[in-house]
């Protein structure tokens, strides 16, 4: 016999070597004449599976390459952002070092030390600002008090000057006394002249006496002191006399009295 009988004889046809009906189970006993067909079917199915697996591998490789490219671009962006951030931070630290005084950064090289010294500098500035504010407030109080006092003094002075002017206009302060009294006494360097005059004569009294002494070739004024006592002025003049010259004290006194 050329072939082994099968249990079932499937009613199916082969076209182009492909099995169109698989509704029947093939018998384990297949004719030797059908071996070529079976191998052809197996080869074609395996080829299609290989093609499908190659497509899957190619697609997976493309996806992997795409993911790698995305990951690399993200890394580059991150590096650029980090580089820019570090440059900005470095410029800020340089600016901070320029703002700090030398005594705060002397011997300090690290960035952390600079930050600590910057905090200390800010605290010191706050303390100084507080002290200056307190000093300003004290000065303001003193100025306001001084202004008030000055205004009160000006009012009092104006009232006194007006009353004094009215008093002088009506009567002199040296009623019953002389307008000017002169005492001339000898001293170690020459003579000492003490003049007491009232307010009305004070303006011209001292200048006239000094002018007279300057015109006299025998006298050289050493010192001149003035003081006020109540309504009169006291002038003390010390004048040096040239060597070998005699001074008539009474004559000098009369000259001063008659000025």
Curated annotation (Swiss-Prot):
GO biological process terms, semicolon-separated: regulation of transcription by RNA polymerase II
Major localization listed first in the record, in broad terms: nucleus
Domain bHLH residue range list: 73-125
InterPro entries: bHLH_dom, HLH_DNA-bd_sf, MASH1/Ascl1a-like
PROSITE patterns: BHLH
GO CC list: nucleus
Cell compartments where the protein resides: Nucleus
SUPFAM superfamilies: HLH, helix-loop-helix DNA-binding domain
GO molecular function, one term: protein dimerization activity
Keyword terms, alphabetized: DNA-binding, Nucleus, Transcription, Transcription regulation
Alphabetized PANTHER family for the sequence: ACHAETE-SCUTE TRANSCRIPTION FACTOR-RELATED (PTHR13935), TRANSCRIPTION FACTOR BHLH125 (PTHR13935:SF111)
Self-association and partners: Homodimer.
Protein name per UniProt: Transcription factor bHLH125
């Amino acid at each position: 016999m050329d072939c082994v009988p099968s249990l079932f004889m499937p009613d199916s046809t082969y076209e182009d070597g492909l099995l169109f009906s698989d509704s029947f189970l093939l018998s384990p006993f297949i004719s030797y004449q059908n071996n070529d067909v079976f191998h052809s079917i197996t080869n074609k199915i395996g080829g299609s599976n290989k093609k499908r697996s190659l497509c899957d591998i190619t697609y997976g490789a493309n996806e992997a390459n795409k993911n790698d490219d995305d990951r690399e671009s993200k890394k580059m962006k991150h590096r650029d952002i980090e580089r820019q951030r570090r440059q900005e931070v470095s410029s800020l630290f340089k600016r901070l070092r320029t703002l700090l005084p030398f005594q705060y950064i002397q011997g300090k090289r690290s960035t952390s030390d600079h930050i600590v010294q910057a905090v200390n500098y800010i605290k010191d500035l706050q303390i100084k600002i507080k002290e200056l504010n307190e000093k300003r407030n004290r000065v303001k109080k003193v100025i306001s008090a001084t202004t008030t006092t000055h205004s009160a003094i000006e009012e009092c002075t104006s009232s006194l000057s007006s009353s004094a002017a009215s008093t002088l206009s009506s009567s002199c302060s040296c009623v019953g006394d002389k307008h000017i009294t002169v005492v001339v006494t000898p001293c170690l360097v020459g003579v000492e002249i003490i003049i007491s005059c009232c307010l009305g004569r004070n303006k011209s009294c001292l200048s006239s006496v000094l002018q007279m002494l300057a015109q006299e070739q025998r006298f050289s004024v050493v010192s001149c002191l003035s003081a006020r006592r109540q309504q009169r002025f006291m002038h003390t003049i010390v004048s040096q006399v040239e060597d070998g010259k005699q001074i008539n004290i009474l004559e000098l006194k009369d000259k001063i009295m008659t000025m």
